[in-house]
A protein has these predicted regions:
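Multi-pass membrane proteins that catalyze or facilitate reactions on polyprenyl-/lipid-phosphate substrates
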Residues: 1-36, 210-298
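Membrane-water interface at transmembrane helix exits
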Residues: 35, 48, 66, 109-117, ...
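Membrane-embedded catalytic cores of phosphoryl/pyrophosphoryl-handling enzymes
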Residues: 128-266
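Alpha-helical transmembrane segments in multi-pass membrane proteins
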Residues: 97-101, 105, 109, 205, ...
């Protein structure tokens, strides 16, 4: 691969990209408070239509339609697409961004599921949190919706990739945005009408997916060139990185949906992710200080 200039964002571009993350994060925080305080419970209860009992034939249909929210489908597809973009752009950024965003999103989602312990509408009529009456964690963990965070994270990655494409592919950005919006809407409606999640679970999930994905993207854009450029990264690092990414794709494709959401794995992943971010940020600060010293000396 020939050396190619690595994409870097200006401070203004980073602020512009961070704005949707702040908005989405604020929406998620507001819904979280409303759910914990029980303010959203009456609304959630009223919006349960119970179609799976009144019209049983709809359950199978909505189960198929909510497939974009299934991690085993959307995550491997996003990872494979990131590999294609990495090869075409001669930059590891697409794959690093996709993997870090999906992992971080999944881990944060799992932590909030474990922290809130909210029951699913299909299994209980009580939308309250901190419900310890269930003996099985599989009956809890409704907030936020994993279906919503999954499709929101993948859609955000697709939209970011579309708008950062080469000029000749830029006209595809609008159709891709429309398609992802439709996929999100179908997932929302299907999960709601199938009683997979409370409505606030779904809205919070979409907000969290957008927020965590953009945060991971901004972090990935700060990585040094030797982490992003295939030639500078070196063959051993490329091999280890490729094996790790393919292993994650296999886990997401074949593991049960509760693999990360209902176990301590989520907490470990968040800790590891934040630790890695802190380590890279510390190195980045050290490099910046060293550059300033060199500039001052010269």
């Amino acid at each position: 691969m020939q050396l190619r200039k690595i994409l870097r964002l200006t401070d203004e571009e980073r602020r512009l990209l961070a704005r949707p993350a702040f908005i989405a994060g604020g929406i998620f925080a507001a819904i979280l408070v409303a759910v914990i305080l029980g303010i959203a419970n009456p609304l959630d209860t009223v919006l349960v239509l119970d179609l799976r009992h009144s019209h049983p034939w709809t359950d199978g249909m909505f189960k198929i339609l909510e497939s974009p929210g299934q991690r085993r489908f959307v995550y491997p597809l996003a990872i494979v697409l990131s590999f294609v973009l990495t090869y075409r752009r001669r930059d590891l950024l697409p794959t690093i961004t996709a993997v870090s965003a999906l992992l971080f999103t999944n881990a944060v989602t799992g932590v909030f599921k474990l922290a809130t312990l909210r029951g699913f509408p299909r299994r209980t009529g009580d939308p309250g949190v901190f419900n310890t009456d269930f003996g099985d964690l599989a009956d809890l963990g409704a907030f936020p919706s994993g279906h919503a965070t999954n499709v929101a994270a993948a859609s955000t990655l697709l939209v970011l990739a579309a708008y950062s494409a080469r000029p000749k592919f830029r006209p595809l950005a609008t159709p891709i945005t429309v398609i992802t919006a439709i996929a999100c809407f179908i997932t929302f409606v299907s999960s709601w009408l199938r009683d997979t999640h409370w409505v606030t679970d779904l809205v919070a999930g979409f907000a969290l997916g957008v927020c965590t994905t953009i945060v991971a993207t901004l972090w990935a854009l700060h990585l040094p060139d030797h982490w992003r450029h295939p030639e500078l990264a070196g063959r051993p690092r490329i091999i280890i990185f490729t094996v790790g990414v393919l292993s994650l794709a296999a886990i997401f494709m074949f593991a049960a949906n509760s693999f990360l959401s209902h176990s301590g794995t989520s907490i470990l992943m968040v800790g590891a992710t934040l630790g890695f971010i802190a380590r890279q940020s510390h190195k980045g600060i050290q490099r910046a200080v060293a550059r300033n010293r060199d500039d001052s000396a010269s």
